[in-house]
Amino acid sequence: MSDIQEQQASIAITLPDGTVKNVPSGSTGFDIALSIGKRLADDALAVTINGKPTDLHAPVLCDANIEIVTFDSQLGRDIFWHTASHIMAQAIEEIFPGSRFGAGPATEQGFYYDVASEHRFREEDLRAIEQKMLEIAKRNIMLQREEMKRVDAIAYFTSVRNDPYKVEILEDTLKHVDTVSLYHQGDFADLCTGPHLPSTSRLKAVLLSNISSSYWRGDSSRENMQRIYGIAFPSDKLLKEHIARQEEAKRRDHRKLGTELELFMLSPEIGSGLPVWLPKGAVIRSELETFLKEEQRKRGYLPVYTPHIGNIELYKRSGHYPYYSDSQFPPLTYHDEDGKQEQYLLKPMNCPHHHLIYSSKLRSYRDLPIRLTEFGTVYRHEQSGELNGLVRARGFTQDDSHIYCTPEQLVDEICNAIDLTQFVFGTLGFSEVQTRLSMHDPANQQKYGGTAEIWEQAEKDVREAADRMGIDYFIGVGEASFYGPKIDFIVRDALGRKWQLGTVQVDYVMPERFDLSYIGSDGQKHRPVVIHRAPFGSMERFIGVLIEHTAGNFPLWLAPVQAVVLPIAEEVHDYAKTIHTALLAAGIRVEIDTRNEKIGRKIREAEIGKIPCMIIVGQKERDSGEISLRRHRSGDMGSFTVPGLIDILKKEISERT
């Protein structure tokens, strides 16, 4: 073979660590993994070629950056769980012929599939489906990708698969696409872009967790479907570890702790998804609001208040009404005494109200930036199956701020908003925070407001601010709001789960729609840029996540009851009451337990109530004029004078440590 032929038959691949390997042209991801090591080949699920996720057995035909994908990565887990959803669908089809399938994606913690079936699934069905999935896995069925013309795919899903849901996707969502891809596994096939596992045999353990109700395409006017959730793993060991984490998650469930610690309640008489804050929970929320208000005051924010409802024309102008119409409560229709009709909406967003505040008077460039802020309650008609205590509610309060600035001030203001968000998360103990730059999808420009040029500038500004702040980020194409790109902050809690909480959004669109302006140094009108900013996001969601992150063990400054005085015997009650009074006067949230119970029981109940400080008072303490301090989960801390204790607690509270 000539040197030229050898060069043509060999390609250079670059691995993530920078290593360059020469391999034969046409080598697959599996071949490359095997050339690195058998262990990696055994663990390989897929491959990325120049950053694009691809099936493991797809050939690599030219020089490329290559990364072998395993279950250790989020991408690997997504691919594994997506394939598991296909295996579950095949199992359901084999057990319950005639079942049809809607959407079946991977999720953050597993997968689900929406199933249309005459059979009403029960708990025992889940166990049967699990066994069938493991049986399919043992068959070692290869997953085969097939590309076909969209018109041929319509014919296939109409006559062969008899699946009206996939036909609808092909005729609607994919109507502008010429070629689509299918994945076959034995007699089962599904419409899918992939990639997928090379074989069903990679699935070694599975747990189907629950069933909920859903609607086809999330539209309550469409067919009702049954959503089956599950998770799968490449080993039994990983499943056992997952089950252990789930048990811990149950212990930390904010709905459970919210009841036990008397933080909030949910009542069907009030309405689904409308949480009510009880006194202790209200303390937590109030302290968080005070914390942010104090910090915002230092940073030049101006507080405002707006109504809970607004004229529907306001939200049509902003675009929120058509954009959020599927998740809004129906309009309220009002007729005045002259018969004139007006329609109002429960407020879905605070921003249109703030824009009108800005435009209520002439603004100068010398006035900018203007930073308006509000803890504003908004309402979304979430599907009942999606409601989840505080973290997914129909009525919730946003720590919403809108910053109106000149284009020249924009990057500085984004940086300031990022800094505030990082400060909030750091204070509240969220040390692991991922940052996503949520960009628009250029292939779906009609989904967004504004021109392509406006979006290009907005995304450039967001990147510049993120780079200036030195934050690590990843890009989320298609994750932007309809009016602009976002910086989304995703925290990892104590159980390793990810929650999208705070956000910073850039908006060139709303200033156009609301004709916002300021007078520049040249005496002419100019258009401001708007930043939407919410470190907490939703107060309810944030507190729900915080409850689970801390397991209800709040820091002293945030605890609903910061201390409890525990007299050992009745003869020291008077001394205990003087301590209680002194702590109250110092601004400490303190209770006193004068029940005729043994001190051990009082301490145990205070520990269960997660009260940070237990102040033990007996004859010895009374005689010495001191107290004995016990800290929650830490035990005995020694003796202190009352003034000394107050100084220690006030310092810890003021520093919010």
Curated annotation (Swiss-Prot):
Its EC number is 6.1.1.3. The keyword Transmembrane helix does not apply. Residues 253-555 are annotated as: Catalytic. Its cofactor is Zn(2+). The keyword Cytoplasm applies. Residues 7-70 form the TGS domain. Its main location: cytoplasm. Zn(2+) binds at C351, H402, H532. It catalyses: tRNA(Thr) + L-threonine + ATP = L-threonyl-tRNA(Thr) + AMP + diphosphate + H(+). It is found in: Cytoplasm. GO terms for cellular component: cytoplasm. Binds 1 zinc ion per subunit. Homodimer. Belongs to the class-II aminoacyl-tRNA synthetase family. This is Threonine--tRNA ligase.
